[in-house]
Amino acid sequence: MSDAPQFPPLFEGLALSGSADPFAKAKTQAIMGCDAGLVVYNLAADQLRAAIVFAPEVPLTEAMPVLISCAIGFQNALGALAPPEVAVHLDWPGGILVNGARCGRMRVAASTQEASEVPDWLVVGLELPLIPLDTETPGATPDQTALYEEGCVDVTPDTLLGAWVRHTLVWVNRMEDEGLKPLNAEWRGLAHNLGEEVEWTFGEDTEAGTFVGTDEHFGALLRSGDNTRLLPLSRLLEGDS
């Protein structure tokens, strides 16, 4: 369906096929001690799935914003490849929105969930539907979409994947060199539902309130009445450490 993606130096690709899950494979490879920069991917006809392995050198709280770097990297990559009228936004729990409808998500896992510990590894995953799950009834779920439904049929998965990794690298480098201020400024311009009422589900738990912004490490601030509470970015970590 597509050519092999082109990655920046120090990044190495590992292609999967069939139903194999790149996010799960990347976690397995990380546990086995693979090098940082491994990009595991599965480019199917109906969806793009990929995951990048990172090796943080800072405690988990300071490492988690790499998820934001990856999300902004994807937005920048798709924004550069898609027609100019296509709008791409991000929501705090990792969702991707294209022209206002949900279109895939980011995922994250790490070797620890302890805020003060330095993770051995951190994996960020991307899942992006290319065509609707139900092609017989397009428009049946107006709040959800797929990339090719939004005028992006000329964006090939291999090109988009390579661009995602390149743009992510730019933001990871900026985060390391300049701190979180540039990342925060970019993200605020892309954030979905900022200043609005939200209801987010985390497993069996639901958090609701007015999304008023983030703290210095991109934890979400939700206001309910006179009370404002913090949801750390580590709340998005999947699975057991």
What residue ranges belong to the model's regions?
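Primarily the active-site beta-strand->alpha-helix module of PP2C/PPM metal-dependent phosphatases
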Residues: 40-55, 59-60, 68
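Long, positively charged amphipathic alpha-helical accessory segments at protein N-termini or as interdomain linkers
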Residues: 2-40, 59-65, 72-83, 101-241
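Hydrophobic residues embedded in beta-strands of well-ordered beta-sheets
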Residues: 48, 96, 219-220
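Catalytic palm active-site di-aspartate
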Residues: 88-100
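A structural signal for short, well-ordered beta-strand segments
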Residues: 50-52, 94, 124-128
